[in-house]
Amino acid sequence: MLAGYFYGFYTGQNSYIRDYLYISWILWAYLVSEEQRKAQEDVAVENKDNHTIYDQLEGKDCQVITFNYTSYASQTSPTALYFHGSLKEYVDVENKNDFLHDDLTTIDLEDFFKNQLAAEISFDPDHKSIPIPSFLPPLKLRPVISKHYIDTWYHASQMVLRASKIIILGYSFSSADNYFCDMLRENHDAQIIIIDKNMETASRNVCRCLQLEANRYTKQIKDGHEIRKYNNRVTIIGADLLDVNLDDV
């Protein structure tokens, strides 16, 4: 839905732009409210028995690229790169200005919409200002809504190119992300490990992305999970992320 209305920015159709503003900020508010709810639950539960992937990444000597919008990756790794944008940022696409929310867990959503965002939006032809959440709709053509994205994609490409081991967690390899697939293919030497509970879908998409033959793999079973190995360097593990210990990968 976001992708369809985003084209209004290319064509200058204000009706599409207004719809995009409405839908994207509603989505942003929902995701932020979910983060706030989870933060309150985490405070109520002092000793959690099950640790999320983000919990496991904390303190690890690794670089993180995330395709999620939530702030969990940045809480785990302050240098995490947000490939598709983040809930913590928004951008005035008309004037190319970037803005940052200080703390999503404490932001008052009603106050933000009424007393801040409403004053920042303007369709006045003499002074147009269109702030939108800094996350990208799933488009094959990467729209550059801010210079910040150019910097992010450059640093991500360098990170992937120089890596000796790449662990990919629950990522769908969407056809809209061909740009990231190009980055992966540029690194011919790194060991690539993909963890996804939907083995068949993951295998099909990974092979398309990395240009591997889908039927040429060695199958193993380890700790009750199916493992497929391709081309002596790409490994797919069919497991739920909650069942994975990153120290063993």
Identify the role of each PLM range.
Residues K60-C62, P143, H148-V249:
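SIR2/sirtuin-family catalytic core signature
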